[in-house]
Amino acid sequence: MMDSDDDMLDAHDMDSVDYDFDSGGTDDDNDIDETDYVFGEADTDDAAIIAYHRSQINYVVLKEEDIRRHQKDDVGRVSVVLSITDVQASLLLLHYHWSVSKVNDEWFADEDRVRRTVGILEGPAPDGREFTCGICFESYPLEETISVSCGHPFCATCWTGYISTSINDGPGCLMLKCPYPCCPAAIGRDMIDNLCSKEDKERYYRYFLRSYVEVNREMKCCPAPGCEHAISFAAGTESNYDVSCLCSHSFCWNCSEEAHRPVDCDTVGKWILKNSTESENMNWILANSKPCPKCKRPIEKNHGCMHMTCTPPCKFEFCWLCLNAWTEHGESSGGYYACNRYEAAKKQGLYDEAERRREMAKNSLEKYTHYYKRWASNQVSRQKAMGDLQKMQSEKLRKLSDIQCTSESQLKFIAEAWLQIIECRRVLKWTYAYGYYVPDDHTKKQFFEYLQGEAESGLERLHECIENDIEVFEFGEGPSEEFNHFRTKLTDLTSITKTFFQNLVKALENGLADVDSHAASSKPANCKPSSNTKDGGKGKKEALTMAGSAET
């Protein structure tokens, strides 16, 4: 483990190749080291949210106005080319899943068929002075009725109720048709604008906006609750699908779960399913209980005596060891705290299989509990770090700036450290899901646990520095000469931790591919040397180089 700041600084200075855990990697890396942090406020007024962007990103965060602009551009292009209104162009694009080329191809191939299919009709002009509404059956003058392209008249009140009900029912309102039976005429945005309440309009245009994103293969809505942003992703040869929204939520473009590097999407799916099913409950029952010999109900032994009594209505009394009736037990069977029958049967191998299954279930449960607790603990720590970051920005930054007589922009290194902690907590969290599926008897397991321990040690050092060392400057009476030393120390720790974690991610994503070849010539004990000896430092270097040589 990293026992001193000097260890981390020495590690950072070591020569390395590619994802040697002590280097910054090559200049063309697109991983978590290539990150520029941008500070900004979210759309909500009650919280300041930090969002970071990669310097070489393969995605763009789109706000609502950006999506509307894209929509408006597509609608305008169709409207101009086909010489139709924007409302009609919107109906066509909705029908053809916002594909401008598909709309143009279908329209010029058979305009009449497209009009009938979409519901853009050219109905007869009304020729009467008074009409009967087809919904409420009241008579109205012509000027008080409304119709779409089909010409079927309905009163404004019935139109409003009909459209409002459809909007409240969900996104199907985007394809709403005339209420006249079997009429295919489409209802466009102009009707919503003229007849609906402000609340209904907002809901309708929210559906309208999302429809543009949902059918676009290069866009996805941010899955964070209440977020209206979308991500435009440019797929390439990189396997990094992690994206970060302006709302501070990071997720995987490929599976839409939260960002989970270095774990692949299939493993994440298995882990989440395991956390949400009853499988571990069954493992606990199997490991800590035995079935009643009569009713087969699982029974947990919670007292020292071997005399067990099943709950009503069964009430069967039996021996916990051999599972035979208690009436058959006594001094001849070994007394109340032992069972000669069980010992004899065990020697004959009669109970080996049941005990083996119970022991396997117990070990499986203990393993899962070990990894799940640490997975969940890092998530809690990450959430706390996010809260500390927001508190620092909203409350402490200005105060620290005043005390140290420096501008807030010069304190950016503090926010960068917190952001690195948040990112490292996320990575560390998912290393426990990764570790759960690494075979226990594999050489990679030992090396993985060594690297994970190094990562935890380095992160704790950074966390301790920003939480504890900064306090003396937050509550000082004036500028301190030691503040520049603190700045240098925190900046160095942030850089070293960032480098270590970005190389850890790369190594795990590569499956620690080179470990097997090194295992043949290196003892597993070398993976975790003592940091108190000179030879131990050499062993650490060799272990770190082991991971770095995979891409040599």
Curated annotation (Swiss-Prot):
Listed pathway(s): Protein modification; protein ubiquitination
Entry comment, domain topic: Members of the RBR family are atypical E3 ligases. They interact with the E2 conjugating enzyme UBE2L3 and function like HECT-type E3 enzymes: they bind E2s via the first RING-type zinc finger, but require an obligate trans-thiolation step during the ubiquitin transfer, requiring a conserved active site Cys residue in the second RING-type zinc finger. The active site probably forms a thioester intermediate with ubiquitin taken from the active-site cysteine of the E2 before ultimately transferring it to a Lys residue on the substrate.
Name of the featured protein: Putative E3 ubiquitin-protein ligase ARI6
Residue numbers binding Zn(2+) 2: C150, H152, C178, C183
Function according to Swiss-Prot or TrEMBL: Might act as an E3 ubiquitin-protein ligase, or as part of E3 complex, which accepts ubiquitin from specific E2 ubiquitin-conjugating enzymes and then transfers it to substrates.
Cofactor details (free text): Binds 4 Zn(2+) ions per subunit.
Highest taxon listed in the record's lineage: Eukaryota
Catalytic activity reported: [E2 ubiquitin-conjugating enzyme]-S-ubiquitinyl-L-cysteine + [acceptor protein]-L-lysine = [E2 ubiquitin-conjugating enzyme]-L-cysteine + [acceptor protein]-N(6)-ubiquitinyl-L-lysine
